[in-house]
Amino acid sequence: MVYVQYLLQIIAALGIFNVWLLRFGQDTEYRGGKASNMSEEFLVYGLPIVAVYIIGFLKIMSAIGLLAGIFLQWFVIPSAILLAALMIGAFGMHLKIKDPFKKSIPALIMLALCVAILLLAA
């Protein structure tokens, strides 16, 4: 089962890197409201622009922690908990602005990955 956990950690980390490093400035069908990039999305949510960088830092550090957890197990649980909390927040933001459910799916999938990682790591 440990290899399943590692696979989920890698998938979650790569997903975060994809969204926050590769697609940060790109329009996607999952952006909140009518935002065309990450900074606009946070403004749509009513958050200050500095929140983009704080949340981004936390998500990227969580992803790095999940990868480091393959070698140093004690990174896994704190990283997965933090990332799960951030995904709950992301889902809440979509609800706040009454986005269609489809836009919440990536956050919910990432939340499910984090819960699975936590269950396997416990």
What residues fall within each predicted segment?
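Membrane-interface extramembranous regions
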Residues: 1-122
